[in-house]
Amino acid sequence: MSTMEEEKVISKSTSVDISEGTFDDITIEKKEEAKLVRKLDWYLMPMFSVLYFLSFLDRANIGNAAVVGLKEDLKLQAYQYSAAVSVFYATYITAETPSVLLVKKFGPHYYLSAMIIGWSLVTIFTCFVRHYWSLVLTRLLLGICEGGFFPCLSLYISMTYKREEQGKRLAYLYVCSCFSGAFGGLIATGLTKIPKSSGLPNWGWLYIIEGLISAISALWILFCLPDDPSTARFLNPREKELMKIRAEQRQKYMGSPNFDWTQFRKAFKDPKMYMSCVIQFCQDLVLYGISTFLPSILKLELGYSSLAAQYMSVPVYALGGISVYVICLLSDRTNIRGWFIIGMNFFGLAGFIILLATTNSAANYVATYLIALPLYPTVALNITWINNNMAPHYRRATALGCNQTIGNLAGVIAGQVYRSSPYKLGHGFALGCTVVGTLTATAMRFYLQRQNKIKQEILNGERVDEKKERDGCDALDFVYVL
């Protein structure tokens, strides 16, 4: 790498000739690069955020439907409702790893729009469910259709943005998942006013309205999402040139666009992937337990009415949305992931201890706010962390797929441990997972620090390099994000 005096700074008036040297010798003017990133944000992030909002809304609306009469109309026992919640993840997790490996082959705009149309139709037809087994079937189908959506969005973000830019962009998605909880509660509250004489139960209209909105939104992806962000139609020639420079500067991180079984196998030999999966499982169990069952916790455990439970869940989700944005923004600015995950989890620990230690409704309601603080940022930052530290593309795609598959197994468990009120088993399990997740994040942080030190010692000639081959994130000049 050249020194700062030797680097060529590319400003608006400068054109790039590859024959002049390597892209590593080129630094884009900061103001111009910031303008490019803002343009990418304005085009891509509203699309991704709205669509992830809708996917989370369609997935989690069973919690709101239960509060407004689904369980009574279908005559569901507590174990049947829990099973219906959990079974979604049985098919959801099977779709994740194949999706991140196939999305490049079929093109993101076709692949993602097909997913959206699929889950929209399943959501709409859920309004006709009249017994337990038909509800289970729709949940299984919904899992198949939604399974690869979030991992593919995460992968697309890693293709478009630099490592230090990714946390904030994933935060946008999680902000929307927070507000889907709040929005779902408000919709459910409004639908309690629709008379049953309209031909459908109140919860049936919930599925129809949300499914139709999702179906229409599929057109946005189909016609507006570029398969390759560096050649997007919304970029002018100068911006495409800058995207090419950014891509070349990240070549070790991105790697070859062709599928490589070697990188697939290397992912499974990497300790980072396994630690990331443990963290994801633990944080996802808390996320799915609270995001799905919060209205039921407020109604059945804290004793509030159905209407009050829906209203009172809104500010809890809103706090989670604010938290994920602020924490991920700070994480990007400091380029630190691990300490934020570890530190935020202490709020969750305090919240679950309160829920387990007292039956006072006011104290328990305050505890839900403490739990909301780390609920979304810890999940978002762990995904960003593994995205940042796995390279090239197909090693990262494999690790991300496994991360999401293992993480979403927690959805199956959450539905079983949050089976019936009082939810002491669920809260205890979530407390234990928070402890394990915190300890694993601490171990991963120090492991990465140690690996960075080893690489630097090899570069300094202080240690013999025992690896015969180094590529991607194993390269000596690839510095792990802590």
Curated annotation (Swiss-Prot):
PROSITE patterns: MFS. GO terms for biological process: carboxylic acid transmembrane transport. One of its GO terms (cellular component) is endoplasmic reticulum. It is found in: Endoplasmic reticulum; Membrane. The keyword Transmembrane applies. The chain crosses the membrane at residues 40-57, 83-103, 109-129, 140-160, 170-190, 205-225, 278-298, 311-331, 338-358, 366-386, 399-418, 428-448. InterPro entries: MFS (IPR011701), MFS_dom (IPR020846), MFS_trans_sf (IPR036259). The keyword Membrane applies. GO terms for molecular function: carboxylic acid transmembrane transporter activity; transmembrane transporter activity. It is a multi-pass membrane protein. CDD domains: MFS_FEN2_like (cd17327). It holds the Pfam family MFS_1. Keywords: Endoplasmic reticulum, Membrane, Transmembrane, Transmembrane helix, Transport. Belongs to the major facilitator superfamily. Allantoate permease family. This is Uncharacterized transporter C1683.12. It comes from Schizosaccharomyces pombe (strain 972 / ATCC 24843).
